[in-house]
């Protein structure tokens, strides 16, 4: 059982096999500290921002007298996501520099690998477990990029075989190879580097004659993921270069990126 708001959480546990179970507190709530504990195969995993601004994941054999040890260490300006469990695999996500990444750890070997299933450098991946069978080695991966329409693949974690299951239909037709996507960093007023995602048609001239539309949104921790948009492409097809600035106020570079663009720091959003 979990009680939480935007910056505080408290969680209780009990043994479902007990006749008259009494909820037990895992950790007393503390302002500014978020945590979420999940169990799998006799282990307990704590996704928390305690002493880790962009979160970390600790592991313990017990909740009665927990002895938390590092499972996934905190990283500067890398937002650590939660865990998804299968019988033989642990799947997790990270976000840094306005890019999401997926990692898969083999429980038997202890080896963790990043799931790389495209040669594109700017894209949005996502893993989902649409089946109830936790014994499976197959997951579904959603994928899109500024030039590639939304796709869903089935992916076998053992064989690494990938199959296209569904693709977003574009009635007017669409060829991703007609577009070029680039990522650069731009220095803001205080020296912080702001990621820019640039999308253009391959035939658009870079001689200064093309129009450019600069878009940015940085509020409430909402990240502007580099995903696909038919509306955007209708402009790009008219030789307009589209640039998305991943400015502060979102969480493209972690919690600090958000905090540097809110409240008394809101000016940074507009300066970026």
Give the label of every model feature segment.
Residues 6-13, 52-59, 98-104, 147-154:
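Structural motif
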Residues 12-14, 27-29, 35-38, 49, ...:
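A structural signal for the main folded, soluble domain(s) of proteins
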Residues 1-5:
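Conserved small/polar residues in nucleotide/adenosyl-binding loops
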Residues 16-34, 61-84, 108-129, 158-178:
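Multi-bladed beta-propeller domains
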Residues 25-47, 74-89, 93, 121-142, ...:
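Conserved beta-propeller blade repeats
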Residues 124-272:
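Serine-hydrolase catalytic core recognition
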């Amino acid at each position: 059982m979990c009680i939480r708001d935007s910056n505080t959480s408290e969680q209780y546990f009990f043994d479902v096999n007990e006749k008259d179970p009494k909820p037990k507190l895992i950790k007393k709530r503390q302002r500014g500290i978020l945590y979420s504990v999940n169990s799998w195969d006799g282990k307990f995993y704590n996704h928390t921002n305690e002493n880790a601004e962009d979160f970390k994941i600790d592991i313990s054999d017990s909740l009665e007298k927990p002895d938390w040890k590092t499972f996934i260490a905190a990283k500067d300006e890398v937002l650590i996501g939660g865990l998804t469990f299968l019988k033989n695999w642990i799947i997790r996500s990270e976000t840094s520099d306005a890019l999401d990444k997926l990692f898969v750890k083999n429980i038997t070997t202890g080896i963790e690998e990043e799931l790389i299933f495209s040669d594109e450098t700017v894209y949005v991946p996502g893993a989902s477990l649409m089946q109830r069978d936790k014994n499976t080695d197959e997951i579904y991966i959603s994928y899109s990029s500024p030039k590639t329409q939304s796709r869903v693949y089935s992916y076998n974690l053992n064989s690494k075989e990938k199959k296209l299951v569904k693709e977003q239909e574009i009635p007017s037709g669409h060829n991703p190879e007609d577009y070029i996507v680039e990522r650069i960093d731009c220095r803001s007023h205080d020296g912080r580097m702001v990621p820019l995602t640039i999308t253009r048609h391959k035939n658009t001239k870079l001689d200064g004659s093309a129009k450019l539309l600069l878009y940015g949104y940085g509020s409430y921790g909402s990240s502007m993921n580099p995903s696909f948009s038919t509306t955007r492409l209708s402009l790009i097809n008219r030789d307009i270069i589209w640039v998305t600035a991943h400015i502060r106020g979102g969480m493209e570079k972690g919690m600090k990126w958000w905090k540097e663009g809110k409240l008394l720091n809101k000016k940074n959003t507009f300066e970026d």
